[in-house]
């Protein structure tokens, strides 16, 4: 099964002022991401407010991204849901429209507390798109599924034919690497922590990843990998440190989903506000965030159109 090389973006979902999905900016969005070195998108996930979307909206978004994706640009559809039946339907739809792959995080309710529960969840969803690679999206901070991922790999190995790997969005670089080493790298371990790309590269990982701050800082995150491959460790270190400074700023403004989405407006692509229950930024907060970003010369270095 093909492994992803390079960084995939987790895009935000554009909304109109009235809260309806705005499909119009997606073409320009896709072109901008490709221009800045991103290799594809992982849509309708946490950054995309997937759990705040209806099933119809999720399918329409998948169709729109497929329509506008540049040649060779991978579209991976997050199909996770609290309803496995809905997830399987979304998986079937993703395969039907020609998506490159699918993924699913564990549901926030009911909380998954055992490996077998998680395996069964993944198994049923993956069966909805048997011809597509399936990635489990490990983000336990969102759903409380603090389960050992090495045990998940052992459990799915030979049981789920299209299980491709894990989008690993957790703080344990040790566990990430142990998963990467399982059976000499059998599974595709996509790095999901933009703040630790460089240390993961140092262990031999992070050849592929899915990021959230890639939306506006992808050019620098891609640069970390490029500098590492070129043997320019100092450049890679400087880019990683800068990227952490950007993350420090968004952490002051409710993180990437809220603060990061507002950054898109500041760099020229207004994607609207977040859906309830997210607390949107005020104009005053936006001004403060902009000043903090200017202080680190972000706008001279960010993604460009």
Q: Where in this protein do the model-derived segments appear?
A:
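Active-site beta->alpha loop and helix N-cap motifs at the rims of alpha/beta catalytic domains
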Residues: 2-145, 303
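Short glycine-rich loop/turn motifs that provide flexible caps or phosphate-binding loops at active sites
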Residues: 5, 39, 44-47, 79, ...
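Single-residue recognition of alpha-helix capping/boundary positions
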Residues: 25, 57, 151-152, 232, ...
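Structured C-terminal cap/extension of enzyme domains
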Residues: 35, 199-305
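Alpha-helical structural signal in soluble globular domains
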Residues: 36, 60, 64-68, 93-97, ...
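Short secondary-structure capping/turn micro-motifs that flank functional sites
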Residues: 49-50, 110-111, 172, 198, ...
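Catalytic alpha/beta core domains of metabolic enzymes, predominantly
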Residues: 126-132, 140-244, 250-251
């Amino acid at each position: 099964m093909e492994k992803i090389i390079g960084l995939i973006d987790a895009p935000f979902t554009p909304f109109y002022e009235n809260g309806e999905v705005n499909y119009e900016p997606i073409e320009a969005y896709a072109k901008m991401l490709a221009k800045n070195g991103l290799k594809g998108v992982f849509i309708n996930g946490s950054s995309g407010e997937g759990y705040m979307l209806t099933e119809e909206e999720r399918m329409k978004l998948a169709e729109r991204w497929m329509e506008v994706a540049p040649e060779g640009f991978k579209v991976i559809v997050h199909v996770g849901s609290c309803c496995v039946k809905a997830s399987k339907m979304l998986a079937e739809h993703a395969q039907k429209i020609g998506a490159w792959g699918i993924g699913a995080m564990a549901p926030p309710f009911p909380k998954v507390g055992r490996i077998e529960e998680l395996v069964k969840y993944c198994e049923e969803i993956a069966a909805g798109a048997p011809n597509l690679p399936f990635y489990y999206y490990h983000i336990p901070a969102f759903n409380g599924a603090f389960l050992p991922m090495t045990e998940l790999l052992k459990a799915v190995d030979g049981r789920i034919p299209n299980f491709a790997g894990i989008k690993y969005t957790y703080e344990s670089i040790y566990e990430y690497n142990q998963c990467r080493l399982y059976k000499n790298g059998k599974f595709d371990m996509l790095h999901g922590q933009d703040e630790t790309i460089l240390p993961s590269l140092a262990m031999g990982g992070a050849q592929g990843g899915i990021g959230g701050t890639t939306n506006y800082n992808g050019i620098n995150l891609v640069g970390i990998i490029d500098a590492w491959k070129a043997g320019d460790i100092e450049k890679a270190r400087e880019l990683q440190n800068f990227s952490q400074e950007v993350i420090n700023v968004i952490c002051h403004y409710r993180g990437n989903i809220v603060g990061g989405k507002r950054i898109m407006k500041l760099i020229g692509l207004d994607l609207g506000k977040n859906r309830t229950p997210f607390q949107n930024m005020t104009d005053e907060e936006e001004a403060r965030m902009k000043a903090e970003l200017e202080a680190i010369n972000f706008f001279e270095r960010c993604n460009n159109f």
